[in-house]
Amino acid sequence: MRRISILLPLTLLSLALNAQTKRVVEEEFTGTHCGWCVRGIAGIEASKQKYGDRLIVIAVHGSVYDATPMSELSEKAGYEEILSSIHGFPACKLDRQTDTLDPYYGRASSGYHITEEIDAQLSKTPPADLTATASWKDADCSEIEVKTNVNFYQSGGDYRLAYVLTADSLKDKSSSWYQLNFYYDMDDDPDVKNDPNLAPYTKESKYIKNMSYNHVPIDGQGVYKGLEGSLPETITAGSSYEHRAGMRVRTDILPNIRKEYLHAIVLLLNKQTNQIDNAIEIDVPPPHTASITTAQNSLPTVTAYYSVDGRRLTHPQQGLNILRLSDGTTRKVMITE
């Protein structure tokens, strides 16, 4: 963010303009039994690497043939009605715009073009900024509380807040977690083998058995239509509004959720358009620690995995791995199991 020094009459205006940070929400619709959905995984990985915290990803899992733990979590989080409107995976919506897009191709029929649609959304000026704090509510670290402050820069409008709790590094050894991969035998397709994001999947088997899933919704509040009364009916420019909501870690559905890899997302829903006008994502603090405030203070996340010889991996492998983080740094990590 640029620092601008302006005489007093314009100072408040300059601060307001600088403060308005637009973030795009990509709700990606996927499933482990969907063979083309690895393209969606490649798309959100590449997009997160490009945009960092300006892009908020929620990987919503549906029941392609049979229900899975992640599809059950997605429905319990509040995505059941939204999933019913999606006809075919992989797919995505950006800020809940009317059009459903491919999470890799965008509106095109091939190639990595979803960035064109993300850029278009990022160019919009949001009506408000959001800040948030996440903290544990109980000694067992099973429930969290999110406190949100919304600062509006324009009057009017009908807005509500919605909350989503997501988890990273979800995995299991049972067959319901195997990711079907239709790219496994496409290394002779030039469009695939020359694509750095898709080519790694040609080296995988038809069923990827050790896939680690990120951005999976595990709980939510008001996901579909927003929480009634979360914001006042009359919005005044220059005003700040506070709201609190609780969510819980759904270990009743999936016992092995890792609580150190949780994220709280707050959506600013425009009830007149049914779209998301802005949002914020923050890390939930590790269990038995203090709260974490706003996206700027969140810990860096893994955006890509590489082998020691520089090959990009679809997931960490046993042995030495090189991790690229969202803050631009890299780390070497040894995986023993």
What label would you give each PLM region?
Residues 56-288:
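Short, conserved sequence motifs used for protein processing/export or organelle targeting and
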Residues 23, 298-301, 317:
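Short, small/polar residue-rich loop motifs at catalytic or cofactor-binding pockets
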Residues 10-18:
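Hydrophobic h-region of N-terminal signal peptides that target proteins for export
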Residues 20-60:
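Local sequence-structure signature of Cys/Sec-based thiol-disulfide redox active-site neighborhoods
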